[in-house]
């Protein structure tokens, strides 16, 4: 390796390390970003830092929305803040485009809320503020290189406060393509699994634990059903792999010396086939054969979602998480790409390498350009 090349690669390795290391602490310090300032996309790290520093747990995304609104308006975009119902009443989807027409060939979109788990919640470094920062930097870099028309019509940016499904009426993709940003480890998604939510409930008869005979233990009934459910063989497919099941919530009982009268659980199935009804039938059979007293309900389902990946030069991947892609209707191509890994998103280990963020800017630029020149 030539000395210059060596120095450059050492520098870039230390940039990557810097953010990853800093991000392990609960707040990213200013010096993390200073140590890691890249030359290629001047706005990238500053923007990412600003986005990550503004909290935006789902249902209260007001501040980060206003920041983006100002940021984009200052750069000459026409910005429309679409109010979103729910949450603390101060949340907006930010829709931005160049020129006077909001009808564009490409819509580039991601979400700005950071998901709240039951115990841990990520700061959104990866999911999905990495995508938002890289998408904006990509559009800005294309503008600088005259890859998109300054007078508009090519690209619109949409940052959703919570869910794209709220946008279907106002921004359905009439253009050629919508590019979605979620963590895909820098790969182009060929599709993602579907979802089936399962609610289970058992009713019993309360009583004193010392005298079990007249009572009926709802927890015992439920647990027998759950144990059988976990052994059920769910349909798989070549493209999407195994259908998997997670029992994520279990509730019931009041005290260890009282026979519980109620117990319930909920599970989420990640569907690898669109045979939703078959999967429901398998689950019902497994639960009811082992424990007839358990009631099952299936409040929500969505089959696996195939996604376009007809752009050369990308590794591709099937993702096991859901997105709102099926909710954005329209006759357009759909691409899904983003920096970072879902394995660290939503946790206090959430972090992103600067090199991945920079690669994402390049890749979003490529995707946008390829669609525009078709
Ligand atoms: C797009 O522009 C049209 C015409 O000006 C307008 O009716 C519509 O509300 C706009 N939509 C958004 C999301 O800005
Ligand atoms: C899918 O399930 C089969 C059978 O249970 C298992 O052997 C295999 O390792 C699973 N594949 C993946 C990718 O988890
Ligand atoms: C699945 O079951 C529902 C409810 O029973 C029914 O309305 C629907 O048509 C079924 N879908 C298929 C593909 O069989």
For every predicted segment, state its role.
Residues 103, 113-117, 175, 190-201:
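Acidic-glycine-rich active-site phosphate/pyrophosphate-binding loop
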Residues 104-106, 156, 176-179, 244, ...:
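Structural motif
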Residues 109-111, 158-160, 179-182, 201-203, ...:
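Short beta-strand segments
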Residues 90-94, 196-198, 263:
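Short beta-strand micro-motifs in enzyme catalytic cores
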């Amino acid at each position: 390796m030539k000395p210059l090349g060596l120095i450059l690669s050492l520098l870039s390795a230390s940039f990557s390390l810097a953010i990853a290391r800093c991000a392990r602490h609960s707040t990213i310090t200013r010096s993390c970003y200073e140590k890691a300032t890249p030359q290629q996309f001047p706005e990238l790290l500053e923007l990412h830092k600003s986005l990550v520093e503004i909290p935006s747990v789902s249902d209260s995304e007001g501040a980060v929305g206003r920041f983006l609104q100002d940021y984009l308006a200052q750069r000459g975009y026409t910005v429309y803040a679409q109010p979103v119902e729910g949450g603390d009443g101060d949340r907006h989807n930010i829709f931005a485009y160049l020129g006077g027409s909001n009808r564009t060939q490409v819509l580039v979109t991601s979400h700005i809320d950071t998901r709240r788990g039951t115990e841990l919640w990520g700061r959104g470094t990866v999911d999905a503020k990495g995508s938002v920062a890289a998408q904006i930097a990509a559009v800005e870099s294309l503008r600088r290189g005259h890859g998109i028309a300054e007078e508009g019509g090519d690209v619109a940016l949409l940052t959703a406060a919570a869910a794209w499904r709220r946008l279907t009426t106002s921004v359905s993709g009439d253009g050629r393509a919508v590019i979605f940003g979620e963590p895909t480890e820098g790969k182009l998604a060929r599709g993602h699994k579907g979802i089936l939510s399962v609610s289970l409930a058992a009713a019993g008869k309360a009583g004193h634990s010392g005298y079990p005979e007249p009572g009926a233990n709802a927890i015992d009934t439920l647990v027998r059903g759950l144990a059988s459910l976990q052994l059920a063989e769910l349909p798989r497919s070549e493209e999407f792999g195994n259908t998997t099941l997670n029992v994520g919530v279990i509730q019931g009982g009041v005290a260890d010396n009282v026979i519980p009268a109620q117990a319930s659980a909920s599970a989420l199935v990640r569907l690898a086939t669109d045979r939703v009804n078959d999967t429901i039938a398998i689950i019902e059979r497994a639960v009811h054969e082992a424990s007839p007293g358990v009631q099952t309900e299936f409040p929500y389902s969505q089959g696996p979602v195939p996604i376009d990946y007809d752009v050369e030069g990308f590794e591709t991947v099937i993702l096991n998480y859901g997105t709102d892609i099926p909710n954005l209707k329209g006759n357009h191509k759909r691409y899904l790409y983003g920096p970072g890994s879902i394995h660290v998103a939503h946790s206090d280990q959430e972090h992103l390498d600067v090199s991945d963020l920079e690669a994402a800017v390049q890749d979003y630029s490529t995707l946008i350009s390829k669609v525009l020149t078709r």
